[in-house]
């Protein structure tokens, strides 16, 4: 089996949310519908089986991805990933980790369809269910949204008591909100949620990689006091030295 073609289709649709340059989703403050777009990335084989994912651009596909994948066996997924990763390392800045991941997903989708098996079975089963947690959008400045710590607390309480979730994760405020990020404001929201849901509910915080080392350290210590389960990506995810520093 060989990969014979790679395609990217662009879809435009109406939405009431906006997405910033780093891919974060925000509610539109005016709640007005506007046109947004996304892409459907597809891998096609000589046996008529195709795999799909989202979010890969047309230019990077035509210039870099297609020349590497076309003619290859999709089962050589690891080899293809290593080739793309090498292209990233030698200066293909638009071939970022998100693009690599989406290409990898399409390859896995292709393999699963060939074998007629779900990917979790191909990778090796361990459990047949996983716990789910409720997760917010980012903070906003909208009435009735997530503009205050109290609104986070109210939403968390609703998710736990009314919807049956057994854990909760906050995404707090960040640009384009002018005053964000603000570590103290984030901790106020975390404290309000903890008070609302009680001591036994696992809580998590995702500060959107917006913080410095010292801010991340301070937030981490405050979250320890609130018995939070984890803090996700407080600093630039590509700065391994920052995470080594924080862990030490």
Question: Each predicted region: which residue ranges?
Answer:
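Structured beta-strand/loop patches that form or line metal/cofactor-binding pockets in enzymes
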Residues: 1-47, 63
């Amino acid at each position: 089996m060989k990969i014979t073609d790679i395609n990217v289709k662009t879809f435009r649709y109406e939405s009431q949310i906006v997405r910033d340059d780093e891919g974060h989703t925000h509610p539109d403050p005016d709640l007005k519908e506007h046109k947004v777009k996304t892409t459907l990335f597809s891998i096609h084989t000589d046996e008529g089986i195709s795999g799909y994912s989202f979010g890969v651009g047309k230019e990077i596909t035509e210039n870099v991805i297609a020349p590497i994948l076309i003619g290859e066996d999709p089962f050589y997924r690891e080899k293809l990933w290593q080739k793309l990763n090498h292209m990233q390392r030698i200066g293909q800045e638009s071939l970022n980790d998100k693009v690599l991941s989406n290409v990898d997903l399409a390859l896995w989708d292709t393999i699963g369809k060939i074998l007629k098996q779900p990917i979790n079975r191909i990778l090796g089963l361990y459990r047949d269910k996983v716990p789910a947690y409720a997760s917010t959008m980012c903070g906003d400045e909208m009435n009735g949204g997530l503009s205050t710590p109290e609104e986070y607390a109210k939403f968390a309480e609703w998710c736990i008591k009314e919807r049956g979730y057994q854990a909760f994760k906050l995404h707090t405020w960040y640009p384009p909100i002018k005053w964000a990020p603000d570590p103290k404001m984030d901790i106020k929201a975390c404290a309000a949620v903890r008070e609302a849901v009680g001591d036994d509910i696992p809580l998590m915080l995702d500060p959107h990689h917006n913080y410095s080392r010292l801010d991340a350290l301070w937030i981490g210590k405050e979250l320890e006091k609130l018995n939070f389960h984890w803090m996700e990506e407080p600093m630039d995810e590509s700065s391994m030295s920052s995470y080594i520093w924080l862990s030490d």
